[in-house]
């Protein structure tokens, strides 16, 4: 999504009745597994892993009426949230300072652009507000979850949706 992939697309193969109808092909023998060598992909994957753990712990605190489970979930949520925040911040900072690709509307030439995603975020203030609101909701839910509140799941879920939506929108801007 943000770091690219080594593959080619040949749409003319769709009309190739007698031969190969494969539209996309990997250009390396790794078939996309080389993406794990980029630290941004690893940071995003681990951030998603620990965010899903945190959401599950918040869900347990909200829906399971057992004081022992609720207390264990509360204790584990703080460590899980801290680990999530480290990996999410690594991903977010590296994304905002990463080089992206832009299209010159006059010539149609695709060229690298430094700080592309930061420029996209600054060009769309509503998306920036959505990103900040989503991050704030997740941070607030971490604090509520640590205090044992049953409402943490609602804030963390809403914050996750806003943050993922904003990250998707800064990718597609021209």
Q: How should these model regions be labeled?
A:
Residues 170-174:
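Conserved small/polar residues in nucleotide/adenosyl-binding loops
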Residues 162-168:
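Aromatic-anchored segments of alpha-helical transmembrane domains
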């Amino acid at each position: 999504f943000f770091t690219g992939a080594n593959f080619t697309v040949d749409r003319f193969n769709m009309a190739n009745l007698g031969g190969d109808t494969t539209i996309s092909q990997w250009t390396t023998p790794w078939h996309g597994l080389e993406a794990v060598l980029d630290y941004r992909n690893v940071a995003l994957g681990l951030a998603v892993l620990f965010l899903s753990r945190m959401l599950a712990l918040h869900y347990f605190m909200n829906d399971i009426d057992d004081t022992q489970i609720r207390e264990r979930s509360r204790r584990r949520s703080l460590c899980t949230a801290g680990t999530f925040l480290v990996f999410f911040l690594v991903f977010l900072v590296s994304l905002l300072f990463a080089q992206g690709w832009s299209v010159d509307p006059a010539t149609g030439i695709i060229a690298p652009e430094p700080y592309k995603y930061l420029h996209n975020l600054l060009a769309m203030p509503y998306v920036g507000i959505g990103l900040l609101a989503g991050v704030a909701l997740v941070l607030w839910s971490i604090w509520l979850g640590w205090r044992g509140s049953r409402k943490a799941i609602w804030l963390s879920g809403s914050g996750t949706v806003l943050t993922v939506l904003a990250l998707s929108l800064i990718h597609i801007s021209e």
